[in-house]
């Protein structure tokens, strides 16, 4: 299995007016509210150095895990490849970042792409770019947390039209539904389950409510066997 970290730096984010107050049109959220200054300060505290990244890679390998990271910008492709990552993750909002996919396809042995917030034609084009690589598609609903009645697990069947390796990125609310969504996805044939992981109480961090702890991770791992 894999251990994944995020590679993102505060200096790479850009100011976009629509995020300062958010944008809602006809009752639908077009842009979330995420002011630049608040986001910059949040990400600055979470930055991981190259030395810390190298330590993460070594700890993963020492424990039989495949180290992986998410690449958010093209400027980081070469540096991540030089750190000896063999596997790379692409976030949902970058499934349609086709220049990024092209560069990743040349640098990494395994590419895992989340497909939330992506139109069907964009998924098809991404698959065309990656067709000569070892790639997987993850079904993902970009709603945090994701209610059980909006999981749309049947989407995995459609994704199998493009690759045999299909999985599910689970952002369900752990306190209410536990591991039910992840287990359902496995039962439906998912080869990959992506979950956020925490060693802190679920309410202590921004993504804590959708993160699993070590006990829940062991339960999920045992179920998958």
What are these regions (language model features)?
Residues 1-225:
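Catalytic cores and adjacent flexible loops of soluble metabolic enzymes
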């Amino acid at each position: 299995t894999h251990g994944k970290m995020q590679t993102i730096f505060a200096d790479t984010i850009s100011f976009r007016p629509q995020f300062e107050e958010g944008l809602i049109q006809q009752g639908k959220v077009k842009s979330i509210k995420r002011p630049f200054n608040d986001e910059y300060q949040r990400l600055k505290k979470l930055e991981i150095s190259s030395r810390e990244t190298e330590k993460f890679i070594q700890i993963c390998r020492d424990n039989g895990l495949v180290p992986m990271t998410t690449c958010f910008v093209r400027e980081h492709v070469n540096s991540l490849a030089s750190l000896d990552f063999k596997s790379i993750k692409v976030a949902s909002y970058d499934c349609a970042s086709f220049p990024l996919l092209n560069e990743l396809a040349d640098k990494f042995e395994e590419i895992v792409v989340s497909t939330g917030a992506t139109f069907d034609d964009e998924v098809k084009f991404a698959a065309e770019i990656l067709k000569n690589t070892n790639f997987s598609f993850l079904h993902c609903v970009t709603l945090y947390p994701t209610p059980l009645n909006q999981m749309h697990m049947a989407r995995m069947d459609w994704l199998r039209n493009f690759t045999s390796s299909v999985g599910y990125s689970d952002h369900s609310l752990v306190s209410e539904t536990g591991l039910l969504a992840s287990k359902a996805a496995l039962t439906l044939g998912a080869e990959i389950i992506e979950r956020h992981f925490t060693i802190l109480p679920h309410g202590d961090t921004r993504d804590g409510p959708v993160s699993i702890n070590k006990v829940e991770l062991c339960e999920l791992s045992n179920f998958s066997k």
